[in-house]
Amino acid sequence: ESKAKFVHIKFHDNEILNFGNIKIKAMHTPGHTPDSYCFVMEDRIFTGDTLLINATGRTDFQNGSASAQYDSLFNKLLKLPGFMRIYPGHDYNQKQYSTIDDEKKNNPRLQVKSRQEYVEMMGNLNLSFPKNMHFAVPANL
């Protein structure tokens, strides 16, 4: 499915990846990019740029989609057990991790009532273009 040329291992939504005795479930969570994935391991999830601590990944470049991210967040991640720890790819806000319940309660981007409200909110963020994106974007596509 991925158009990335450097992918060494291709996997699919809900596929179990085995690393010795460690099992990690791949969860396709498009939105930040079409190929965004989160990885579930026991009581934790590595959320990359999909769900951050008190924020969500931006969707305004790299073929992102706020509508797809809404589905990834509200129909997948937020349905996980509340105690599950989340470890984002960056923007930790000086915390080592958060939990699904903490994000439901405290994340301002998760307080919306509908897909339309989320899409409008994400479209109105007016974020500045990140530094070094001319290097990072090609590496992520």
Q: What would you call each of these model-derived segments?
A:
Residues 71-141:
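Accessory terminal helices/loops
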